[in-house]
Amino acid sequence: GDYTKGKRHTIDGLQAPFGVAVDAQNRVWVSSSYNNKLTVFPGDAPDKAKTIEVNLGGRGVAVDSTGHVWIAQQSNSPQGALPPGAKMPPNIPANAPQPKTIMEEFEAGAEYLLTNPNITQTGMVGLISPDMKVVQQDIAKGTAYIPWGVSVDGNDNVWVGNLYGQSLTHICGVKPANCPAGKTTGDVIHNYQSGVIQMTTDVIVDDAGNLWSANNWFDGEVVINPTYQGRTSTFGGGQGFVVTYGVAGPVQNPLMGPVRRPR
């Protein structure tokens, strides 16, 4: 195509759009950071958008080989419920207006982290059927802590960059035969943590089954603390990419539409 002839579209349902995926029917699936809608529209007819109610604060979106869609959600309900025992920062009122910029959003998120030092989970992963029905909404509940990026591997299992959880979460997909014995769709297979996995955002699988993940932050407190942190003052930004060798089912790249195994 000719990129100079592109057009900006206003799509009903979008509010701070974040993740994008395209399925085999050429439908575009888009999450929104600032509402509880997953928006779906034909690639050749963006004016015919439909929405699905999900939990407030959508992030990464991925399509598996069967057309099911997986979405990272940063809260515990469509209304943005917090986990038991969690509280909002004192300077953020109830029903606060949405942040105006991504940095304001990060600041609010970091304040939530500091206000709740004993909380270890917030958010979960959702599974949507090809006919746009919610199949499961609370996947990885208890493990997910601000889940961010989502990728599907060649076994149709799911990988999530678990930002505040500082981990890579491996989830059994829609083909339990490809999962360890006793695991079924939506079960956490393993939650990978190590000294090199920091505050992770996006994650992707290559043709050899290696998992690549982005360390976005290193030390969350250093990122937002207004006072000098001494010897840790340079620990703000994350330290590059992490490759976890051979843990995922190989994927045919480049990824165009639903995930595919290498030929």
Residue ranges and their predicted role:
Residues G1-R263:
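Flexible "stalk/tail and boundary" regions
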